[in-house]
Amino acid sequence: MNHPSLALLDSPPAVAYISVPLAGCRAKRDWGGFAYGVETTTRTDSACNVYRVNIESRGECKRPGGKLVGVTVACAPDNGHVVGCRVDGDFFVEGDDAAVDRYLRRLNAALLDIVQRDITQCDTPPDDPDTVSYLERIARDEHVSVTSANAETILTALRRALSACGRDAARPASSRLASPASVTAHDARRRATPSAASAVPTSSVTITPAASAPQASRGLTPPTFPGEWHERWHRLAPKIVVDKPRRPQEQMDVDVQWSREVAAGERPATIRFWQWASPAVVVGRFQSIPDEVHEDVAAKEGFTVVRRCTGGGAMFIEPGNTITYSLYAPRWFAADLDIEESYRLCDMWLIAALRGLGLDVGFSGLNDIASSHGKIGGAAQRRFPPIGSGPGSILHHVTLAYDIDAVKMTRVLNISGEKMSDKAVKSAVKRVDPMRAQTGLSRDGLIARLADCLTQPDGPGAN
């Protein structure tokens, strides 16, 4: 049901509104299953519907070579007090599901505590070493590993969110963000749950990206891999499956199901080449859909928005332009390796296969695969605990750009300036280097060549 619009409250630029029916509801956005609720004031419209209303502001930060972190703060409209904080982004968090859930909830609560203490006391900058240690301790307590983001990144995003909603000006200079010009709150909008509200016209906000940092080394020199890694692949001997076409949500479900079957010892190690039945935007486990996807444009263009079980960024999927595969392996396969090494192990066969086809490719950052001209694809991982007497499993999936309508991608995805701030090439369109032009192969032909590499006598990734 569409509810009548509420009267707009006087507010600074770069804020958004959430309106929620009072009856048992809480302010909520799609945060990957981690909704946060805030108690705020209420409003009554002309039809006597009672609403809770809060004002939102968002800040972002991305350290060079790392992943984007976004923090959204919710403020009560009557007094401006911050009543909720929420972290989202492209980062990865490794740990069992319950521990990851607890970590995110504690992190959100800690940010709210930091803000409230800072506002009332104004004597300690919230990004001082003690505050950084406070956030780092939460990850240690919950036995999770946060990759490609750190406490300083989270706190900087928090300060930018506060600055965007006008809270920073009331603080002493010692507790303000060091670079106030780097405010990255963006795409302010008015939203209503359960029905969407019309956009609120907002004043323009100047977004000044952080200084450009050198792009991460792409490692285009042919990588070498330890002989012991080749032995792991020989022992793994994965089954190769070129799957039937599946719709987006079914793809997500199959990934989890097959991972759990391997974790239980009910399925052998498998590499599945996906076939997409329809276009999709696949967001990462910890991303905020409204801040990553222009949902109205996606719907108009026929894209289904789904969430995968792994971290990382959004994937733009058109069936004929995308090659996706998943590796489902027992956990021993990546035992005793750090996170970066496990990515290299799982993708060593792919690098060898693409180089065998004449592509100048290598690793970029933690989880990207790139040529000398741009990004070809990205990977993500998740570990599943043993089920019964099973070995546990590691899910490693990769999406490659066979071809791409990059202009359409920029219409559908909401790619912020902060996300591109450490890239030498600032245009998302120019950063993608599809394989179609490089190989001259059809999509099916390229998949067949990749599958052949996995079954060669010397094993995947053999030189």
Where are these regions (language model features)?
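A glycine-rich, hydrophobic loop/mini-helix early in the fold
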Residues: 273, 279, 292-334
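Short linear segments in intrinsically disordered or otherwise low-structure-confidence regions
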Residues: 191-197, 208-211
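Short, highly charged C-terminal tails/helix-capping segments
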Residues: 143-153, 367-376, 463
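Compositionally biased, intrinsically disordered low-complexity segments enriched
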Residues: 116-124, 173-179, 197-206
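Catalytic beta-strand/loop module used to bind and position nucleotide/cofactor moieties
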Residues: 16-18, 32, 42, 51-53, ...
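Active-site- and interface-proximal helix/loop "cap" or "latch" segments in soluble metabolic
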Residues: 68-168, 435
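Short amphipathic alpha-helical segments
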Residues: 99, 103, 107, 150-154, ...
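Active-site loop/lid in soluble adenylation, ligation, and acyl-transfer enzymes
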Residues: 2-39, 43-68, 152-172, 176-177, ...
